[in-house]
Amino acid sequence: MKKLKIIPILFATAFLAGCNNINPSSSSISSPSSNSSSATSGTTASSNATSNSTTDSATSTSSSSSPSSISSSSTSSSTPTIEEGVSKYSHFQSISNKSRQAGFLPSLGNPNILVIPVDFSDYTFVEAGAKSNEAARERIEDAYFGERNDDELHESLRSYYKKSSYGQLDITGVVTPVIRAPRTYAYYKSITNSSTQTDLIDGIIRLALKTLDSTYDYHDFDTNGDNIIDAIWLVYSGPIDNGGNSMFWAFTYWSYMEDKFDGVDVSPYAWAAYKFFDEGGYTDHPDAHTTIHETGHLMGLDDYYDYDGYRTPAGGLDMMDNNIGDHMAFNKYNLGWVKPETITESGTYTLKPLTSSTDCFIIAPKSYNDSEFWEYYIVEYYRPDGLNKLDATTKYSNLKMFTVNGLRVYHVNQKMGYLVYNQRKNSYVWNNSYISDLDSADFESEDKYPYIINSNTSSYSYNTKKDTTLVSLISAAGRTNTQDGKNSDIFTEGTSYDSKNLTWEDGESMNFSFSVTSVTDYSLTFTF
């Protein structure tokens, strides 16, 4: 029996597409095995034409006194040196690549992505509000690769990720001439079957890459040498339609076309409307919230809202939840931008703000395998500044980031286990055991393979304990199953947490507590 590789088919944006409007049946996580591919970025594009056809990881210093006093001392004061046109996967991405057999936009270095504007004979970029195709391309260029000053709040994709990664990720790329889709907007809108939709988008990608073949060498968009285009972005001119099963919203997918272009494959791509740039109503720059969120998916990050619509375990206030703010420490750990210190003893601990430093700590069970793929608490000093400032100041999709300084705490359960083929169900089920040593895990077996077991969407989780989530906000106010994060969820000076009678999933007693003793604009101190 040939092994069925599975990856999430559609990663949707939380804004406008809306988790309550997403049909879970069109977002299944099964897809056939095929060649993999991945996405990247480059420089700028030229003419207008329409086609027919870590920083250093955080370090801790213990004093000789007891209890220990530990300060996380890493900051982003110096920008790492990035080799132009060279990128690489984080550890999380490398393992995920083996698990899903799919490419990702590398999260470290200088990936090069291909941004393709797509219009329709019955809905052009002029009808979408641009003065011309060239004007549309210039606006797309600004949204993706525009330079921003430190005091500007309306980030481009590139400027956001340079700041969020502390200079460890510099996404560059080209915006190509406009490509005319082979069918009308009305035709595509009439298609409601998700498999047909992605086949049609494959057709648009195929047409675009063939049309542009004499203009670009697609090897330039494979910066990590895996023979996969780092990433493709399709920006379509048609209106957003987030109702029912329309394809005209924003999502990320992995193509399985067998075509090669200059010898490289196509794998991750994102699809979103030009109209998303209007959502914030900004006059100085396009709104890039949706672009930034979907690019997180291109790098392998999951959605943290619930597609079933029952809950929002992570509280809604993160770039991978409701498209707002900076990435939380968990995301940065996955993408290789921070290396959290693990708390192993009682003491006093100090953090600098995550917006300006790589400081964060992990609280974990004895079984912790020193990787992203386990169960742990991850703690960070949250401040409503830097990449959090815009969304802490103004609402986006009726939500605002936390507006207070304090300790933000998440519980993570990103363990991997073997999925085993069940012939009766014609699907894969979890064998109820976890893999602690992923470096020696079997990714080649025909009848089982490692996969992340938990999800924030119950129907996507392989864990029969449906209350076990991938990542959840630990509320200082004691709220559970949070829908929208509130300031009271942040641990401010004088607040504390006690794990009481809680246990880790393996049955080990948590048996820890912490108290926030000091919060300034520059640091936060807590006792453990």
Located regions from the model:
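Bacterial N-terminal signal peptides that target proteins for export
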Residues: 1-7
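A generic structural micro-environment signature
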Residues: 7, 124-126, 307, 326
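Short, linear, compositionally biased motifs with a strong N-terminal bias
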Residues: 10-13
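Zymogen propeptides/activation segments of proteases
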Residues: 20-23, 76-224, 230, 236-243, ...
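Ser/Thr/Gly/Pro-rich low-complexity, disordered linker/stalk segments of secreted
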Residues: 22-83
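Extracellular hydrolytic enzyme modules, especially secreted metalloproteases
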Residues: 231-398, 415
